[in-house]
Amino acid sequence: MGKEADSKIRDFIGKVRKKYNINKAILFGSRARLDHFKNSDYDVILVSPNFRGIFFSERIAKMYDFWNHYPLEIEPLCYTPEEFKRKLKEHGIIRQAVREGIEI
C-alpha cells in the first residue's frame, strides 16, 4: 500500500472506529494486494457491534459520509460481529478478504 493510500485509509478507519466502535477493519482487494491502479477503489470490511439494528445499506451510506472528502472511491462492507462470523462461513469473498487482506 502506498504512503498516500495508507494515510487515507488509516485516517478513515480511525474516524469510523471512534464513532462506531469498529473492532475489526480489513483492507482487501487490489489495494491490499498492491496490484491496484491509481484510481482504484478501497475495498474494506468493517465489523462493529454498533451496526446492530441498522440496515446494511444505511451502514454503507454512513461510511460514505466519513469518506466523502477523499478523492477516491471506497466500497465498504459493514457487518456486526455475528454477521461477519456467519459470512465468513458462507461467502468465499469474505474468506479471501480475511486471508489476503490487511487488518488495520
What are the residue ranges of the model-derived segments?
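Short beta-strand->loop micro-motif that forms the acidic, two-metal-ion catalytic signature
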Residues: 43-47
